[in-house]
Structures are given as C-alpha cells and as structure tokens.
From Swiss-Prot:
Similarity section: Belongs to the endoribonuclease YbeY family.
Keywords of the record: Cytoplasm, Endonuclease, Hydrolase, Metal-binding, Nuclease, Ribosome biogenesis, rRNA processing, Zinc
Recorded GO MF terms: metalloendopeptidase activity; RNA endonuclease activity; zinc ion binding
Encoding gene per record: ybeY
The organism's place on the tree of life at top rank: Bacteria
Name of the protein described by the UniProt record: Endoribonuclease YbeY
Subcellular location: Cytoplasm
Lineage: Bacteria, Pseudomonadati, Pseudomonadota, Alphaproteobacteria, Hyphomicrobiales
One cellular component (GO) term of this entry: cytoplasm
Keyword Thylakoid: no
NCBIfam families associated with the record: rRNA maturation RNase YbeY
Length: 195
C-alpha cells in the first residue's frame, strides 16, 4: 500500500456537480470490493451496501472518471487499522479511516493508457470500534458516519486532501454535497474535521 495521500485533485477528475443526483452513471463508478476482515462488522449487516452506495455517490457527484478503475475497502477493527497506521504513517494508534492511493505518477495517462485493463485507485481501511464510538459520541446513526468515512476515504484516493485550510474546506464542502445527496446531514455541523 502506498504511504501517503496525493495533494490536490487529479486532472482526471471533473468538477463537482450539484447535489441533485440524476441516475448514477455506471461509467463513472469504480469496481469496488468490500472485504470484511473483522468479525465485529457482522453486527452491521448493511455495512457493505452502505459503503458501496457512498462510493457510488461520491464518484458520480464529483464526476470522477473512475469507471475503469478498481478499489478495495477493508472493514477491519481498531487493531487492524492501528497496525496499518503504525506501519505506513508511524502513528501507533487506531483512527477511523485510512486511505492508500495507488501510485499513479500521472493518473490522466494511466486512465488513457490502460488498454482496457482496470486501474487500481487504491485501498481504504475503516476501523469498526472507532467508527462505532464516534457515531455514538456524536449521536449519529452508524450508517451515516460510515457513509461519511467511505466518502472521505474515496476522495483521498482521487486526489483530495486536507493538509491546508483551503484543501480542507474544498474536501469538506465536497463531502457535504455528496452526503446531502444521500440524505445525510452535514457531518461537520457540530464537530472538528476528520483527520
């Protein structure tokens, strides 16, 4: 897995649309594999469909040219995310979501030169206990918080970041629009930024 998120937006990503989605274009939606890597996720029977719906909404809303791409989402536990966080970021503690964009020096060229083969966008890992605790602490439905984190992780894979205030505002605004299209309230209304 790559170590860092790319800064800014890729040239292969289109401008954001308004939040009134039409039918989702399957040409924009990346093939997404959801892997349940920890038994604790069995308590959330709809987790896989929640993640898939969030990623489809994100890809459609930002009009991403990701239809020939693949990504994997690992639903794991705090121990799994802590190990990844320690290995790839040098931070020995769990977090809610990690994104590992695939190395793509020039994503636009990769989109054009794939010869029909899917391009790997990267991987997302989501920690059950942290997501559950945050949702409970913030009084949010678990599915809403999981949707937010799936969207957040996906946006990192396609080039969004929050290293600067300007980047954070762009990313958060995009997240709000995507989630509003899913009927999910502003996740930042009464809290600090996702980090």
């Amino acid at each position: 897995m790559p170590q860092s998120n790319a800064g800014g937006r890729s040239d292969c990503i289109g401008a954001a649309r308004d939040s009134s989605f039409g039918p989702m274009s399957s040409s924009a939606i990346p093939a997404t594999e959801v892997v349940i890597a920890a038994d604790c996720w069995q308590a959330e029977a709809s987790a896989e469909s929640v993640v898939l719906r969030a990623i489809e909404a994100a890809a459609t809303m930002i009009d991403a040219d990701t239809g020939d791409a693949e990504l994997a989402v690992m639903l794991t536990d705090d121990d799994g995310v802590r190990a990844l966080n320690a290995s790839y970021r040098g931070i020995d503690k769990p977090t809610n979501v990690l994104s590992f964009p695939a190395p793509q020096p020039d994503y636009q060229d990769a989109c054009q030169d794939s010869g029909g083969a899917p391009q790997m966008l990267g991987d997302i890992a989501i920690a059950y206990q942290t997501v559950r605790r945050e949702a409970d602490d913030e009084g949010k439905p678990f599915a809403h918080h999981l949707s937010h984190l799936a969207v957040h992780g996906f946006l990192h894979l396609v080039g969004y970041d929050h290293e600067t205030d300007a980047e954070a505002e762009t990313m958060e605004s995009t997240e709000r629009s995507i989630l509003a299209g899913l009927g999910i309230p502003d996740p930042y209304a009464d809290q600090d930024r996702v980090s």
